[in-house]
């Protein structure tokens, strides 16, 4: 994959359920703690190294932000680091929360 792909929250949900990709949330710590998609790894500058050690470059990565804008830059960055398949989630957490209100976890 030479460029990241934009996907819907429904597509992201299916990939997550199938174990076909991991999900990272790049929002600020307070927003993440107030609610995030289950199984979402809170990806920050401080946690990037741990994420990369845990998930090899052959891992498909889905990036979630607030509204689906910031995730595009993060997705491009992950591609540049060497990840083979990276997706940006259209609508971000706002769309996820609207579509899957029962699938929101709280806490850090």
From Swiss-Prot:
Name the CDD domains for this protein.
GlpE_ST
- What molecular function terms (GO) are annotated for this protein? thiosulfate-cyanide sulfurtransferase activity
Q: Which residues form the signal peptide?
A: none
Gene3D superfamilies documented for this protein: Rhodanese-like domain (3.40.250.10)
The UniProt keyword set, sorted, is: Cytoplasm, Transferase
Database matches in PROSITE patterns = RHODANESE_3
Query: Where is it predominantly found?
Result: cytoplasm
InterPro entries referenced in this protein's UniProt entry, alphabetically: GlpE_sulfurtransferase, Rhodanese-like_dom, Rhodanese-like_dom_sf, Thiosulf_sulfurTrfase
User: Biological process GO terms, please?
Assistant: glycerol metabolic process
Q: What class of enzyme is it?
A: transferase
Q: Where in the cell is it found?
A: Cytoplasm
Q: Which residues are responsible for catalysis?
A: 65
Domain Rhodanese: from-to ranges: 17-105
For this chain, the family text in UniProt reads: Belongs to the GlpE family.
* Functional summary from the UniProt entry: Transferase that catalyzes the transfer of sulfur from thiosulfate to thiophilic acceptors such as cyanide or dithiols. May function in a CysM-independent thiosulfate assimilation pathway by catalyzing the conversion of thiosulfate to sulfite, which can then be used for L-cysteine biosynthesis.
Task: Cite the HAMAP family for this sequence.
Answer: Thiosulf_sulfurtr
User: Can you say what this protein is called?
Assistant: Thiosulfate sulfurtransferase GlpE
Organism of provenance:
Salmonella agona (strain SL483)
């Amino acid at each position: 994959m030479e460029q990241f792909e934009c996907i819907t929250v429904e597509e992201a949900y299916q990939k997550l359920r199938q174990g076909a990709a991991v999900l990272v949330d790049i929002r600020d710590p307070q927003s993440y703690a107030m609610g995030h998609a289950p199984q979402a790894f809170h990806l920050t500058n401080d946690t990037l190294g741990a994420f990369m050690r845990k998930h090899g470059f052959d891992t498909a990565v889905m990036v979630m932000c607030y509204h689906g804008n910031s995730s595009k830059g993060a997705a491009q960055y992950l591609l540049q680091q060497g990840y083979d398949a990276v997706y940006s989630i259209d609508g971000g957490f706002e769309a996820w929360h609207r579509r899957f209100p029962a699938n929101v976890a709280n806490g850090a």
